[in-house]
Amino acid sequence: MYRLGLLFACALAAYGQKINVEFDRGADFAKFKTFAIRAGNLNSRNPALNSELVKKQIEADIERSLSAKGLEMTTGRSDLNLRDTLGSARRVETEAYPAGWYGWGTRIVRVPYAEGTLVIDLRDPTTRSLVWRAIATEEQRDPSKLQGKLDSMVKKSFDKYPPKVK
């Protein structure tokens, strides 16, 4: 029974959020003390995502996450300029269910869903170069859970800030 539970937990983990972070290894992240949020983009045909309320929520989550890391938000000159982009794409999940002997009657089921992507860029305004980027992707099957998913995507993205250079 323990093995079955472990297998189920591993299967669930495969369907979770995907967070990818890349950064400039030559950047000195200790010098960044302030940030400013610049106009982001909402690139979605999904009306649940293409909303000013969603944009404000993302910006509030970002501000909360960076403030917890010791950075201060400013509206003037800043050490980092932040821009976020939210988009969504239609995807189709295909599953095959064998229904009979010798492969006869295999049933194919296609389930459409939306996949949301949040890209957060941090740029150094003095050099105008990208110093840190997080790309968070997750399935959006239930619109009522959107707010919690966005909160989680932002938090998990900034769990990897500042990056640890190896």
Q: Language-model features: where?
A:
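Residues that line or immediately flank small-molecule/substrate-binding pockets and catalytic motifs
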Residues: 8, 39, 138
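A structural "domain/chain start" motif
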Residues: 15-69, 77-86, 165-166
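Solvent-exposed loop/turn segments at secondary-structure junctions
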Residues: 42-44, 72, 87-91, 127, ...
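Short, charged/polar low-complexity linear motifs in solvent-exposed/disordered segments
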Residues: 38, 92, 99-100, 148-151
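Sec-dependent signal peptide recognition
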Residues: 1-7
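C-terminal/domain-edge helix-coil "capping" segments
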Residues: 17-32, 110-117, 122-166
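Surface-exposed short loop/turn segments
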Residues: 19-20, 69, 80, 84-129
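Hydrophobic h-region of N-terminal signal peptides that target proteins for export
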Residues: 8-16
